[in-house]
Amino acid sequence: MKDKGYLIQRTTLLMKHKIEIVIPKVENIEIELDDSNSPNTVKKFVENLPFTVGMNLWGEEIYTDESPIKEKEENAKPLVELNDVAYWPSGKAICLFYGPTPIGKKDEIKPYSPVNVIGKILKPEKSVLEKISDGLEATFQLKK
């Protein structure tokens, strides 16, 4: 009797969450979180919804004041891609990258220090994101 070879494939379910960032007097931002890179960070993010934080700018990055999320580095990346959404463990902040940062070289988006990538910006266009100014308050909530 011959042994039959079987390929056993494990599948993991990718969890996605649509989040709305409500900013009074500015168009809302829609992001989509997925747990493929930093599942623990995404889980803590969703568990803490809704929350309201101040917003700040650094180059073409929007980052929040300290959020209620407390997570260590989880597959943290020193470089990110255009429209990445990340959690910055050092500052307990949420970061939205829509272009270059002051310390990135040409055509690279470099966070201040490594970040846990947790999703992507879906809407709006960059021209709307550029209208956000330091100090605006934003509420992160599940999209209805």
Locations of regions flagged by a protein language model:
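Glycine-rich active-site loops that engage anionic ligands at enzyme catalytic sites
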Residues: I31-K44, N48-K144
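Start-of-domain signal
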Residues: D3-N48, T52
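Intrinsically disordered, low-complexity segments enriched in small/polar residues
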Residues: M1-D3, V117
